């Protein structure tokens, strides 16, 4: 299990976001509240 993820937000969907870390894109399924705080192209830390 992954406990945290830090990287660049490369895509934001209706129920998930893709965060790129060291060249690997991770799809993170999360709440609408968390998705609303993410900005495409900026760094994010998801816990």
Give the ranges of each region predicted by the language model:
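A positional/architectural concept
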Residues: 1-47
């Amino acid at each position: 299990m992954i406990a945290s993820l830090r990287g660049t937000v490369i895509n934001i969907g209706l129920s998930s976001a893709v965060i790129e870390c060291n060249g690997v894109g991770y799809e993170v399924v999360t709440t609408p509240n968390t998705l609303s705080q993410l900005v495409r192209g900026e760094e994010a830390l998801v816990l």
